[in-house]
């Protein structure tokens, strides 16, 4: 998780900074942080309309038009670019993954997802769908749970 925390520092998003790593056989196979696609201007350079115009979007809205690639997505894509299978791997993220990232992690074969900070949909209907997805994943043996940090470790949240 410490590497995911360090990785999130690369994010240039005007909102949250999120980092994620994929681990297989106790080896880090990919890292990712949230940000614009390769070659696009970063959020802090005006690359994302949603980040540049937050007043235009209600809280929790507009993510479908956000240009940014989520940290978990970037980690999956980096593993694919270099030819690493993520089947059976674990994901460590600084934020509880969104609905889309949970689906993608499952589809890619990730079997455990640990996160540092809580996140949940603010819309009640979306929250129901999210909880249903968590139930489906649990029924398929996929662990989605917060990571308990050892006592005395610097607060990294």
For every predicted segment, state its role:
Residues 1-157:
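Zinc-dependent deaminase catalytic domain
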């Amino acid at each position: 998780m410490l590497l995911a925390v360090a990785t999130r520092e690369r994010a240039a998003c005007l909102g949250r900074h999120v980092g994620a790593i994929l681990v297989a056989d106790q080896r880090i196979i990919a890292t990712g942080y949230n940000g614009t696609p390769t070659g696009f201007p970063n959020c802090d350079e005006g690359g994302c309309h949603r980040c540049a115009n937050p007043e235009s979007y209600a809280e929790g809205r507009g993510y479908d038009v956000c240009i940014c690639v989520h940290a978990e997505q970037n980690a999956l894509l980096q593993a694919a670019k270099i030819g690493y299978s993520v089947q059976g791997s674990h994901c460590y993220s600084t934020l509880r993954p969104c609905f889309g990232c949970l689906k993608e992690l499952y589809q890619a074969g990730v079997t455990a997802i640990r996160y540092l900070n809580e996140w949940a949909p603010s819309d009640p209907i979306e929250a129901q769908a999210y909880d249903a997805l968590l139930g489906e994943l649990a029924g398929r043996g996929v662990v989605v749970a917060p990571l308990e940090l050892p006592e005395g470790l610097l607060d990294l949240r």
